[in-house]
């Protein structure tokens, strides 16, 4: 009986720890300006924000890795937790790639004027 309860409680604890982990997805608090219209000062300011956002995303991904490392692979629900973790990780990479493409377009447009 105790073993059965333990098997029910452990996954709940694991999911709960993932749900309440301190891995907060960083918010992108800026818009990439139009390179054709932006001033040099605006572009330099945005470059700093882009770099900070990339650094924040790297911290987020490290946090996800650290949280997953705390969970035993022996846990019955480990594969599902690992899958959710990978989805969050990959989504942050895709967001960073989209932002980098947008920034690259703005820089090329700025340099072409």
Residue ranges and their predicted role:
Residues 33-113:
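Surface-exposed, polar/charged faces of alpha-helical domains
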Residues 12-13, 64:
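Short, linear, compositionally biased motifs with a strong N-terminal bias
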Residues 10-11, 30:
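Short N-terminal leader segment in a subset of presequences, especially plant chloroplast
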Residues 14-20:
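N-terminal signal peptide c-region/cleavage motif recognized by signal peptidases
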Residues 13-14, 79:
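Alpha-helix initiation/capping motif
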Residues 22-37:
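Short N-terminal segments immediately surrounding and downstream of signal-peptide cleavage
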Residues 1, 20-22:
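Absolute protein N-terminus
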Residues 1-8:
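Bacterial N-terminal signal peptides that target proteins for export
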């Amino acid at each position: 009986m105790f073993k059965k309860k333990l098997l029910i409680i452990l996954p709940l604890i694991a999911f709960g720890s993932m749900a309440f982990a301190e891995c907060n997805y960083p918010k992108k608090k800026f818009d990439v300006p139009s390179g054709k219209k932006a001033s040099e000062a605006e572009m330099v300011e945005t470059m700093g924000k882009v770099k900070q956002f990339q650094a924040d995303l790297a911290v987020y991904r490290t946090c996800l890795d650290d949280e997953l490392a705390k969970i035993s692979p022996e846990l019955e629900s480990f594969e599902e937790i690992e899958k959710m973790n990978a989805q969050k990780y990959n989504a942050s990479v895709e967001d960073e790639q989209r932002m980098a493409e947008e920034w690259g377009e703005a820089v090329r447009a700025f340099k072409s004027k």
